[in-house]
Amino acid sequence: MEPQADIALIGLAVMGRNLILNMNDHGYTVVAYNRTLSRVDDFMADEAKGTQVIGARSIPEMIAHLKRPRRVMMLVKAGHPVDEFIEKLMPHLAPGDIIIDGGNSLYQDTIRRSKYVESRGLLYRAEE
């Protein structure tokens, strides 16, 4: 499979779905992923039908669709879920790839995560 997507977005609640569609409308190819796979299926069959959005059913599949440097945005519940996804993503990413936390994380958590992720050669950006 030839990587073709510009960014991946994890989290298909209302904000995630709408951000994916907005990026698609502006010419970006986005990979959509959610830990509840039925949300991916429903999104792809409904709002994303007929778009350039790519649905992924696993993290390795999601990463395989991305052009380098790979960009993964998370819109997941603040706290432990962010840490869980960082741990799930890191084995599949390489130095220079970017993890973006678009959620509402506590700034102390953002500082801790940034140091951790960047110590492994990845970039970490978050809303503050």
Please provide the spans of the model-predicted regions.
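NAD(P)+-binding Rossmann beta1-loop-alpha1 motif at the extreme N-terminus of oxidoreductases
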Residues: 1-68, 92, 96, 125-127
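Short glycine/serine/threonine-rich phosphate/pyrophosphate-binding segments
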Residues: 17-18, 81-84, 107-111
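Short, well-ordered coil/turn residues at beta-beta hairpins
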Residues: 65, 75-76, 102
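Glycine/threonine-rich flexible loop motifs
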Residues: 71-88
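Rossmann-fold NAD(P)-binding glycine/threonine-rich loop
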Residues: 87, 94-98, 102-128
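The beta1-alpha1 cofactor-binding region of Rossmann-like NAD(H)/NADP(H)-dependent oxidoreductases
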Residues: 37, 59, 79, 107-109
